[in-house]
A protein has these predicted regions:
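A short, histidine- and acid-enriched strand-loop-helix "catalytic/donor-clamping" loop
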Residues: 109-139, 155-156, 186
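Conserved donor-binding/catalytic core segment of Leloir-type glycosyltransferases
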Residues: 194-227, 238-240
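Short N-terminal targeting/anchoring amphipathic segment
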Residues: 77-93, 104-110
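Short, structured helix-loop element that forms part of the nucleotide-activated donor/catalytic region
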Residues: 231, 238-253
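A short, basic/aromatic alpha-helical/loop segment that forms part
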Residues: 187, 213-218, 228-231, 246-247
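Carbohydrate-associated surface elements
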Residues: 163, 184
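Conserved nucleotide-sugar donor-binding subdomain of glycosyltransferases
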Residues: 1-83, 135-138
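Membrane-proximal helix-turn-helix segments that form the acceptor-binding/catalytic region
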Residues: 73-82, 117, 134-157
């Protein structure tokens, strides 16, 4: 049946008729827990396993797939109020919810990405200790799948700069939907700033205003600056921003 085929397409990371999937999860009789523990999902996972991952332990694979799809399936069980416009500030689960709302209510969907969700999740998963080996790739595929859905269904997708736009297109967003909306800066507000005494020298001052956290990859910036300083000794780096979000990382920096 078409619902089974749709779920298999999701798990196999193939082109998916998401309308069929959204309709499935809005049927009263569908229980997420029963679906994940039932024979249909078991057979779908087994088929995926036999085709793509026959060299790993099946029981581990089965429970991982249940864990991966539990939050996604629960999101799709949610009721979304009718609106003229839905605005998602990321792809991921938010993008799934926005896409589902558009499916049921026929409204417009705007996605405005600050960071690129798929790339950020990929970086986190690569570094994560709680997921190993091939399972990292499986999680990353699921994140890409959700973002692709959001890009496909959105009417407009914005980002902050051209490189982010290129990433969105690379991840499947149609170029005609993308727009760069940079953070606004009024230079006149900074014209009369007082220069600190420690900056009144012949150094070339470079500033970074950010949260000192792993997602900002401050360590790489420091290493890059060290390389640059060898080439240009007059450089001086200032890192400005909160350090309390990940104090251990801040100390390492």
């Amino acid at each position: 049946k078409k619902e089974y085929a749709g779920l298999l397409d999701i798990v196999m990371n193939r082109k998916t008729d998401w309308g069929v999937i959204f309709d499935l999860f809005h049927k009263e009789r569908v229980s997420v827990d029963k679906l994940l523990m039932g024979p249909d999902f078991f057979e779908i996972v087994r088929e995926c396993y036999n085709r793509k991952y026959p060299n790993i332990v099946f029981s581990d694979f089965l429970w991982t797939m249940r864990s991966i799809y539990l939050p996604l399936f629960r999101i799709m069980k949610m009721d979304v109020p009718k609106a003229d416009l839905y605005h998602c500030v990321a792809t991921g689960y938010a993008g799934v919810l926005g896409s589902m709302a558009k499916h049921f209510h026929g409204s417009s969907l705007l996605i405005s990405e600050h960071g690129i969700y798929t790339r950020e999740r990929e970086e986190e998963l690569i570094k994560a200790d709680w997921v190993k080996g091939v399972y990292k790739n499986i999680w990353i595929e699921r994140c890409k799948k959700m973002s692709f859905l959001a890009y496909e269904k959105a009417d407009i997708v914005t980002c902050l700069y051209e490189r982010a736009k290129s990433l969105q297109i690379e991840l499947g967003c149609p170029e005609e939907k993308t727009q760069v909306t940079p953070n606004g800066v009024d230079p006149s507000r900074f014209e009369n700033l007082v220069v600190l005494p420690q900056m009144q020298d012949d150094k070339v001052h470079v500033g970074a205003i950010l949260r000192v956290t792993p997602i900002k990859d401050v360590k790489t910036m420091i290493r890059a600056f060290a390389y640059a300083k060898k080439k240009a000794p007059s450089l001086k780096l200032w890192i400005m921003g909160p350090t309390d979000e990940d104090e251990e990382y801040a100390k390492e920096c």
